[in-house]
Amino acid sequence: MDHKKTSIRTTALAALVLGAVAAPAFSAPVDQATYNGFKIYKQQRCETCHGATGEGSAAFPNLLNSLKNLSKDQFKEVVLKGRNAMPPFEANKKVAEGIDDLYTYIKGRSDGTVPAGELEKPQ
Ligand code: HEC
């Protein structure tokens, strides 16, 4: 038996197994913008009206549907200026400064590329 060959094969197998263990299990990798948007969505209370998943309820629009129709500018307009029972957020620094990230997060939810619920902080 060629001992050298076997040991190389064993090393390769070990690397494969270790690699599989090191990879995060089933976590959706998101970029920094999406993660920031998610934090703003939660912390600035969008979720109290539009729901933790963004899907709204009888009284509040489903933002996953809304973002299939609203342009980014229309999104910014309604969030910053408000509309009817939607409060204006332009005086909220976190929202006003993070509006692009907020859009990225909700757009990702709408497109189905960002899962509902907690997101892992990007490395
Ligand atoms: C107090 C409850 C409340 C909060 C908090 C709230 N919204 Fe709204 N939002 C509403 C209501 C009600 C509407 C529907 C307004 C209307 O009828 O014109 C709405 C509408 C919207 C729309 C437009 C939807 C469409 O289809 O045109 C967007 C986008 C939106 N909200 C995003 C947000 C974001 C982002 C936040 C957090 C920064 C937020 N909302 C916080 C109640 C809320």
Curated annotation (Swiss-Prot):
GO molecular function, one term: heme binding
Disulphide-bonded residues: none
Keyword Transport: yes
Binding site for heme c: C46, C49, H50, M86
Modification note: Binds 1 heme c group covalently per subunit.
SUPFAM superfamilies to which the protein is assigned, alphabetical: Cytochrome c
One Pfam family matching this protein: Cytochrome_CBB3
Signal peptide residue numbers: 1-27
Record carries keyword Metal-binding: yes
Protein name according to UniProt: Cytochrome c-555
Natural source organism: Methylococcus capsulatus (strain ATCC 33009 / NCIMB 11132 / Bath)
